[in-house]
Each structure stands twice: as structure tokens, then as C-alpha cells.
Amino acid sequence: MSRKTPIERYRNIGICAHVDAGKTTTTERILFYTGLSHKIGEVHDGAATMDWMEQEQERGITITSAATTTFWRGMEAQFPEHRINIIDTPGHVDFTIEVERSLRVLDGAVVVFCGSSGVEPQSETVWRQADKYEVPRMVFVNKMDRVGADFLRVVDQIKTRLGANPVPIQLNIGAEEEFKGVIDLIKMKAINWSSEDQGMTFTYEDVPADMQDLAEEWRMNLVESAAEANDELMEKYLEEGELSEEEIKAGLRQRTLNNEIVLATCGSAFKNQGVQAVLDAVIDFLPSPTEVKAITGEDELGNAIERHSDDDEPFSALAFKIATDPFVGTLTFMRVYSGVVKSGDTVYNSVKEKRERLGRIVQMHANKREEVKEVRSGDIAAAIGLKSVTTGDTLCDLNNKIILERMEFPVPVIQIAVEPRSQADQDKMGIALGKLAAEDPSFRVETDNESGQTLISGMGELHLDIIVDRMKREFSVDCNVGNPQVAYRETIRGTTKSEGKFIRQSGGRGQFGHVWLKIEPSEPDEGFVFVNEIVGGSVPKEFIGAVAKGVEEQMNSGVLAGFPVLDVKATLFDGSYHDVDSSEIAFQIAGSMAFRDGALNANPVILEPMMKVEVTTPEDWMGDVVGDLNRRRGMIEGMDDGPANLKILRAQVPLSEMFGYATDLRSATQGRASYSMEFSEYAEVPKNVANRIIAERT
């Protein structure tokens, strides 16, 4: 079966932004104009098509990335039919992981900003993630009908706060209540969308006389940006002082794909103005799968290999999301990078080293499914019923194995204890937590060794609220929830050598394991590093792995207060063994003993998660807010001017001091200040706090 749409006409894009920038509303309008939904769903009515979980519709935020396939031929039907695969991503900071795994598989992104709030903290996080994966992007400044909306101010913030190079290809006509439409700077025409048919039709008009000078100034900026794409365009521009519409588009496209510029558009999705032009810009300026860098991976021997977006290359795909569907079970969302795969084919999961049979393959429209017989390079689809696939796994051809680069997931910073209310809930809770953990790599489940409690950890209070809520709704599990606890960690600051000797000899076969370890800090964020420097066989090869396992087990149990130990390098340099009595378990225990004794003598410290906090407050309350953050052991890092006489405070504050902050901030500022926070890093706890934590744990 051949392709319906040539791959050059594919666009795999993400729509991402800060909470409340109007991202889901923008996606709803895209679905409406591309003919996929006949009635527009509003977020504030709880009817948005892309927000299909009950919690999303209740809270009016997007939690999971819904994937949708649509088709577009242009506002004037000026293009052949293009296939647009859209991923709508959450904007709340607790769900940053969803954004990360979406950007990993996209070719381009539309970043939505609010016309009045401009660049907000989560926008910076999303922008950094897009930089990391080198995703070409464009900007849609939404909510131009809101009080305080200012397109060019937001463009300036994108330049100063994000370090990007924005090039407006439109200007707004009027703002706030007076917002009427946009000027297309490439055509130098005003676009007026009809309010009678929800913006399905439009007319081109002359640029308003009072905006002619401003439009010409920004058009010159646009043409110069296009001319810088290559020498040919620059020569023509210098000779003639102008470029044709096609040349402008070609130059802007080339520079966007090279991540040199970011094109900026504006509008109001809610008022049905501007989204239509965004769709045209997606086709004109964002890349097809063949225009982005080939994906790199490793073969079985660890050699680097590439896969291109080509149906003739061997099949390779990345599983970027696992979702539990109430009717069909597990859905594995995958991005196909190369080759073709049909339903019924057997593929290889190269990370887990297992074969998987692809039963049914479906293309998603939010939470509606359409079954397809095959998927090809460039496609985003979901497979039903895969057994052992988790997020970040590679699926590939049985005879051409490849591991695409793994995604890195953040360490959870907050945990709560959950207890089932009845014995019946006990069994269901285990199943529910297992499924939810498979869906979300930033959510972990563990059992406390001392109390036997089940602990769940995640990226924030909202994250864990939603997990508990989903257990109740989707799996009918009732549970009691404890107070949030901070996920402390331990590490060492010094270097030491230590001996671990485990001997049990009481008639018959005994146990004997003896090791010497050098214990020192590893590089920050390097995790656990184990080095084997045994020469001459003082510890036989078959026991080396057991020593490493013993060290790792002790690291998980901690040495000071029972918290997992981070960033340690352990070097096994000597030891001895017994021909008969030595065993793996003996060396495992010896490794564990050596690590515990050594770590206690290597200046162990407790680490706590530090949060990057941004508080937006009216100037009158500034002193109160700063004083309160100082009381919470916060370090003020800087201050910026926000919109409408607001100040934006940036600070680093320990997570343990931030519980209940929302309520305190509201009462201190009469509800006029707001804040956001995200994990920054683990930092050493002051001595007095460390002593208190150790006392509470022992």
C-alpha cells in the first residue's frame, strides 16, 4: 500500500506553552478549521476535544499529550493537501516530562504566548527543552483581545528573556477590545476574518493608513532577515532593495529550519482570528520529516548509526508515551523514524531485548481511534497491546537492530504515603500504581523498608493529586493519603579507603568475602560509578558484579538518615577470597559493609531539592514577599519588571519550606500575587537542619 500523502507534505508539530496561554483552545481551533470537529470545544466549558481525561476537563488544564492527525490545504486552498500530526502538550510545571517526551519526537513546534502575560517561567522551561532537541519553532502570541495585550512587547521579551531572534511576519490591528485582525507583512495586506462563520472565511484589505509606517518598518526587518539566508538572496536584496514573496518565504524557511530565527504571529484563538494563518505558516516554514537531522542511535556493538526518514530503510520507531485506554488496554504512542511496519508484524524492542507483535495500529484524534493497516516513516501512531514496552524504548526491525538515544527523566522531588482503605483496595492499588508508573517515568512507586508503607513520588503536589484522583476514577481504588514529604538525598564530600570483611564459618560450608574499596564523590549528576581495578585475581571475576550490587544496595538505604545516596564513585582495588567458602552473597555483603563504613568516614551530607521560584506581585507587597522568602531560607536571585506595575521576583528556595506557600502568599498580598516553581537542583542542607532531619529519622 503506497502513501496517501508524500512525506514532504508531513508536518509533525507540537503546540506548547505556559499554563493559560491558550494552547488547548488554539489546538481546538486547528481541529475546527481542518474539518475534524464540527463544534468547537471550549476549555472553560470543560468540552475541549484534546483534553479527554475527566481531571483535565474539570481543572481546565492539559495533563497528557494527546496526539491528533489532521489535513490542511491553506486558507485559500493554495497548497496540495498536507498531513499535520499535532501533539498538544501540558503547560503546568509538574508535567514538564510530558513536554520533554513530545519534543523528542517532533520536527517543529508552535509555542503559544499570552499577549498580556508574555514570557512566563514555564515558557522558559519549554524553550530550553526545545533548544536541547534543536526543534525549529514559530511563535503565536494569543489572547490579543485581553486587557494589557501588546504583541511587540512580547516579541521583545522573547528576545531578552529567551535569547531568541524573533521575526514578526504579522502585526496586530488594534488590541484588547479593539483587536480587529492582523497585517500580513509578507503580502502587505490586512486580513479580516469573518465573525459570522467563526473565521472560516476571510477577506484581504489594504493596510490601515495609520499603520502604514509601522508596517513598512517591520516589513523591512522581515525582508532583511530573509535576505540573510544566503548570498544569492542578499545580492538581489542589495541590488534591488526588495525580494519577491516566494524569495522571502524561501529565505525565512531556510533560517527557521537552521534555528537562526523564530517567526512570530499573533491573534486570538478564542475570537477565531489568527489560527488559520498559523496553519499556513506551519506548512510554509516548519520542516517535513526529511528536512530535519537524521536520527542517530547505536547498533548491538555500540557503534553509532543513522536512520533517515525513508520508507526503504529498516523499520525504527521510538515509544514516547504509554497510555491506558478504558476500552482497549495499553496504547503505546510511537514516532516512526524509518521504514514501514504493518499490523501483525513482529518487531524487536532493543532496550528490553524482547520481541513484540504489533497487533492493531491506530491513528488518534484526541481520544477517538481510527484503525490503520500500516505506518510509515514520519508517522505518529499508537499500537495496542504491546507487553513490555515502556517510555523511551526503541522498536526496530528484527534483523537491523538499533537503540535510539534514550530520554533522560528528572528525579522526583516530593513523595506521599498512600494506604488502601480495605483489603479489596490493596490488590487493586498495586495494579493501578503499576500501570500509572508505566505511563509516566517521572512518577515512582516504592515500599518503605521500615514502615512497609507504599510511597509514591512525583514532580509536585498537583502531579500526585492527579495520580491519586486517577486511581479512584479509573481503577476504583480508595486510599488514604499522608502529608507530602520531601525526597531528601545523601552524598559524600570526602575520599576514603575502607575494608569490608564478611566471614561465617561454623562447621560445613561457610561464607567468606573480603574487599577493599576507595570511595569518593563522582561528577555532579553522574550517579553511581563502579570501577574494577583488581589485578592478579585477588577477587575473582565472577564476584565483581556482586560487590557492585552490594554497594548499590547500601547506597539505596543511605548511611546517615536512610535516604538514597547520589553521585558516588566506588573503586574496588583489593580483597581476598576462599576457594570453598566464597560466594556471590558473601561478596555482596562485604561490598555493602565496605561502602557503609567508608561513606560514614567520607564526610557524608544530606541534600535537599531546591526550587526555582518566581513570584509576580504588585510593588506594594514587595517587602512582605521578600521577607517571607528570606524566612523560608530562600535566596533572592533577581527582580524584573512585569506587566501593569507588577514585579517579578526570582529566588531559590528549599522545597521543604514551600508547603502551604500558595495560601500564605494569598493572605499576605490579599490574593494579588501569584507564583510558580520548578525543580532546580539538589543542594547541601545546613548543619542545624540536617541534625533535625537525622533526629526525626532515627
UniProtKB/Swiss-Prot annotation:
Residues 8-290 form the tr-type G domain. Keywords: Cytoplasm, Elongation factor, GTP-binding, Nucleotide-binding, Protein biosynthesis. It holds the Pfam family EFG_IV. One of its GO terms (molecular function) is GTP binding. The gene is fusA1. GTP binds at residues 17-24, 88-92, 142-145. It is found in: Cytoplasm. Belongs to the TRAFAC class translation factor GTPase superfamily. Classic translation factor GTPase family. EF-G/EF-2 subfamily. InterPro entries: EFG_II, EFG_III, EFG_III/V, EFG_IV, EFG_V, EFG_V-like, EFTu-like_2, G_TR_CS. The keyword Disulfide bond does not apply. It comes from Photobacterium profundum (strain SS9). The keyword Protein biosynthesis applies. This is Elongation factor G 1. Catalyzes the GTP-dependent ribosomal translocation step during translation elongation. During this step, the ribosome changes from the pre-translocational (PRE) to the post-translocational (POST) state as the newly formed A-site-bound peptidyl-tRNA and P-site-bound deacylated tRNA move to the P and E sites, respectively. Catalyzes the coordinated movement of the two tRNA molecules, the mRNA and conformational changes in the ribosome. SMART domains: EFG_C, EFG_IV. PROSITE patterns: G_TR_1, G_TR_2.
